[in-house]
Amino acid sequence: MITDKKMIQKKMEAIRVFILDMDGTIYLGKNLFPYTHDFLNTVKATEREYYFFTNNSSRDLAAYIDKLHGMGIDIDKKQMMVSTHVILRWLKKHHDGRRVYVVGTPALRKEFEAHGWILDEEKPDIVILGFDTTLTYEKLSKACTFIREGALYYGINPDLNCPMEHDTFIPDCGSMAKLIEASTGKYPEFFGKPSGKTLDYIVEETGCSPDQIAIIGDRLYTDIKVADGSQVTSILVLSGETKAEDIDTSDVKPDIVIEHIGELAKLL
């Protein structure tokens, strides 16, 4: 684990692409961090690229692009990665044509429909669990019934909590999965960070080798863990969920630790 600035600077020489988490890394809730623009401008000035990757499956691609635009960050579609697209690509390869029951927001359901999936409320082949801020007892009950009856069961993102303003949190997809597990005894395979399928997706989308990629985020068990056992550089920022004292008690160790991306901008 590197904290020395000169060593971080040396490590950054090989990096061509930065994959940035969003909540807790570039903004918190509705508030953009004051150093975010400086970091992004520095990345471009040093002829590197940046992409955003969010595990938050409650919104669609357009919503995230619009949110960034509203914060003064204009990006191409290819620069915005969402955990939903990781599972959609995998499902297309392995379960094309199957019928799905999506526990998710209207935006998530529309995303599945836009990619050609048939949503089935009666007898689906697959249950998909997303971060559902519109969750109801009826949805939970149906999902549990379908899972007990033998439907395949996949989760989009394993995050337990979603960070909000004023150091508050709301239950995320991982917490919902634990609720379903308590009822059915089944826990899903997840596809967002830290899944190896997400890492494969990032490498494929960027066209870079793993040793040229750095992933930046505020969560040890998703943003940092996704790089474990790979040549991808993991950079933990302390501007979101994780505090410095959490690192000592965690099995997941980042390659680099910084207070926030504003510090990293000075080392590129």
Spell out what each predicted region is.
Residues 49:
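N-terminal phosphate-binding loop and flanking beta/alpha elements of the actin-like ATPase fold
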Residues 2-20, 27-45, 62-78, 88-268:
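Asp-based, Mg2+/Mn2+-dependent phosphohydrolase catalytic module
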Residues 56:
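Conserved phosphate/oxyanion-binding catalytic-loop motifs
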